[in-house]
Amino acid sequence: MGRVRLLTEGDVTQLLPMSLALETVESVFRWQAAGQTVNKPRVRLRAPKGFLQVMPAVVPEVGAMGLKAYTVVAGRVRFVVPLFSTETGELIGILEADRLGQVRTGAASGVATKYLARPDADVVGCYGTGYQAETQLEAICAVRRIRRIQVYGRDPE
């Protein structure tokens, strides 16, 4: 087996700017629409003190297959993505994936905004101030000239 790369949360943050995430998510959406990917629904398994959830996928265009797995234990969620070569089946990388999921989710909203929002849209509303809000807004601002952001949350701050 070749060298396996481990990317930490810090590595992912450094290596995955929103511009790259937008480009990649748009490409994968195109491949998915063309039937060139395999993406299965989430599998949820109950554990004595929490849950394990797994989402497998294959993307031949990039030579990778893998899964996103995450645990929910004591109110804490942790994500990891092991990736394998579609050519050899070898493990090629393991990514800590909290930030990856956050950026990917934001990028999906950015791609949707690019194609579905009016070209002159310059105001965005964001419901919620939690984990996903920052990258949702970052991605939308990357594809539209946003002049005003209205954020709605349960807490005044």
Where is each model-derived feature located?
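N-terminal ligand-binding/catalytic initiation module
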Residues: 1-102, 110, 120
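Short, flexible micro-motifs
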Residues: 38, 69, 131-133, 156
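Short, contiguous, pocket-lining structural segments
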Residues: 17, 132, 151-155
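Structural motif
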Residues: 126-127, 152
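NAD(P)-binding Rossmann-fold cofactor-contacting core
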Residues: 143-157
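Short internal alpha-helix immediately C-terminal to a glycine-rich phosphate-binding loop
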Residues: 104-124, 131-143
